[in-house]
Amino acid sequence: MIERIWSGSSLVYLLLLPLSWLYGLVSGLIRLSYRCGLRKSWRAPVPVVVVGNLTAGGNGKTPMVIWLVEQLQQRGYRVGVVSRGYGGKAEAYPLLLNAGTTTQQAGDEPVLIYQRTAAPVAISPKRSEAVQALLKQQPLDVVITDDGLQHYALQRDFELVVIDGVRRFGNGWWLPAGPMRERASRLNSVDALIANGGVAQPGEIAMRLQARDAVNVASGERRPAVELPHVVAMAGIGHPPRFFATLEKLGVAVEKEVAFADHQEYQHGPLAALVSSEQTLLMTEKDAVKCRAFAQPNWWYLPVDAVLPPDQAEQLLHNIEALLTK
């Protein structure tokens, strides 16, 4: 229902416009208060790169964060990541992730980033505290903040925004009548704009998600997803149809699709009931980090990598590296 409202195909959004106007007013005043110095912001002693969204709901931000971390690591930079840790509840903040940190503590996206990149990751509702915790632990050349475009309490040196290249900005309204967190004109002040899927517009960098072989959640075995038998596909991400479309493009014969809410918490019983012993449960990697402790032998996940055009990727990295060598 929310997708129909935000896309403009349902007139229900008209009923939500008063709330959207209020949201837009408040968010605009918050940003203005920081720009005018009425609220204080904190500047880190190292460059901060924000990877964020202008809209709510599954734009492909996490794969982009992972790509950026890995690219900078390959160039010899010491990279740290901070996040709010949405979906998790730590006993105390800031929380520095380690091999034993659970998604219940830190949220699924920080755990996924930590496991994929081995970069130091810290979470806190106050991102400045997370940055300070990272720097206290070890020296870093750059900090990447996962989301946080609207978190103006932390000053940033480079803003990178990921948009859904297919859905774009929906009906163009602020939350909750539409998907917008800020006006589209906010893009005029960012340093890079990544279009995930669809057709990139002038000034945007095209990005696509490339699937790897499927991985068994329990054993780590790898196999082409198309070889998995009797697949039941599940996704608890911001935009589940993207995952299902990826499987279709790969030629995976999906018998059933199951969509969950983003950051959904899972338990063994309900997930096990989705498939018989002859079927395969195929999920996203973001879902898998929440299921490893109780995974069954017929549970698999599909890792994806962000892929950018080489020339545009090189220019993007060049612009970021220029900050690190000042």
UniProtKB/Swiss-Prot annotation:
Q: Which InterPro entries match?
A: LpxK, P-loop_NTPase
Q: Which UniProt keywords apply?
A: ATP-binding, Kinase, Lipid A biosynthesis, Lipid biosynthesis, Lipid metabolism, Nucleotide-binding, Transferase
Report which superkingdom the organism of origin falls in: Bacteria
Instruction: List the molecular function annotations (GO) for this entry.
Output: ATP binding; tetraacyldisaccharide 4'-kinase activity
Work out whether the entry's keyword set contains DNA damage.
no
- EC numbers listed for it are 2.7.1.130
- The family this protein is said to belong to: Belongs to the LpxK family.
Q: What is the protein name given in its UniProt record?
A: Tetraacyldisaccharide 4'-kinase
The major lineage groups are: Bacteria, Pseudomonadati, Pseudomonadota, Gammaproteobacteria, Enterobacterales
Hey, which pathway is this one from? Glycolipid biosynthesis; lipid IV(A) biosynthesis; lipid IV(A) from (3R)-3-hydroxytetradecanoyl-[acyl-carrier-protein] and UDP-N-acetyl-alpha-D-glucosamine: step 6/6
Q: Which Pfam families does the UniProt record give?
A: LpxK
Enumerate the Gene Ontology biological process terms.
lipid A biosynthetic process; lipopolysaccharide core region biosynthetic process
Question: What is catalyzed by this enzyme?
Answer: a lipid A disaccharide + ATP = a lipid IVA + ADP + H(+)
Q: Where does ATP bind?
A: 55-62
Identify the GO cellular component terms for this protein.
plasma membrane
Residues making up the signal peptide according to the UniProt record: none
Q: What does this protein do?
A: Transfers the gamma-phosphate of ATP to the 4'-position of a tetraacyldisaccharide 1-phosphate intermediate (termed DS-1-P) to form tetraacyldisaccharide 1,4'-bis-phosphate (lipid IVA).
